[in-house]
A protein has these predicted regions:
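Extracytoplasmic gate region of multi-pass secondary transporters
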Residues: 201-223
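Helix-loop-helix hairpin linking two adjacent transmembrane segments in secondary transporters
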Residues: 112, 116-169
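Helix-breaking motifs and short loop linkers at transmembrane-helix boundaries and internal kinks
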Residues: 23, 55, 76-82, 144
């Protein structure tokens, strides 16, 4: 999860360089941010149940492959359009990685302590979101051709993580359905609310998460 999230946030300090290199307007930068969020939102809504169907490990592997491919495409981007495509891919991969890794941490937690699994998930995400801009900023300042070389650490770490995950073999969870073709209703999102007694803390927590990511996006856009 940490490596995948790092790849999603790595480009934030590079946007001023892209703006100077391609002569971008502020609206172009906004569009690039929206492209990533569109991919992430679509992934969370329509691909969030893949882990229930196939298990978290295959979904996590494919998510890491996709985010590494998106980061590599970012390094090779030759126009705004190609960079937007890379950000959409990274957004889709971000949703796959965060959902599957969160489920995996919960399932592999031997103590069955949900709070501990949640803390580990939050720590991994925060570390990845912090390392991404840090590595991107340092590479942009000190390494030649930063619009290409800044992505190298993420590509290398992504490759290592993919290799490591393919060495891990876990039994198929009993809750996973038998392999087969997805019907249309399997792809459609199911948005539900918890029982009435838990709705207020649920909505407060959701508002807190929304505000946190909104503030992060605001400051990242001003970097």
């Amino acid at each position: 999860m940490c490596v995948g999230v790092m790849g999603t946030a790595l480009a934030s300090p590079l946007y001023p360089l892209y703006q100077a290199h391609w002569g971008l307007q502020p609206s172009h930068i906004t569009g690039i941010y929206v492209a990533y969020m569109f991919g992430a939102l679509a992934s969370l809504l329509f691909l969030g149940r893949l882990s229930d169907r196939f298990g978290f490990l295959p979904v996590l592997r494919h998510g890491l492959v996709l985010v590494t491919a998106g980061v590599l495409l970012s390094a090779l981007a030759w126009s705004v359009a190609s960079f937007v495509v890379s950000r959409v891919l990274i957004g889709i991969a971000s949703g796959m990685i965060t959902t599957s890794a969160s489920i995996g941490l919960t399932q592999l937690n031997r103590s069955s302590n949900v709070m501990r699994a949640s803390a580990m998930t939050s720590f991994a995400m925060a570390l990845g979101f912090g390392l991404g801009p840090l590595v991107g900023g340092l590479m942009a300042q000190w390494v030649p051709q930063p619009l290409v070389t800044a992505y190298a650490p993420s590509v290398v770490l992504g490759g290592l993580a993919i290799y490591a995950l393919h060495q891990v073999q876990l039994p198929r969870p009993a809750s996973a359905a038998a392999p087969g073709r997805f019907a249309l209703h399997d792809w459609l999102p199911r948005i539900t609310l918890p029982q009435p007694a838990l709705r207020r803390p649920f909505l407060i927590a959701s508002l807190g998460a929304f505000s946190t990511f909104g503030i992060f996006g605001l400051y990242a856009s001003l970097a």
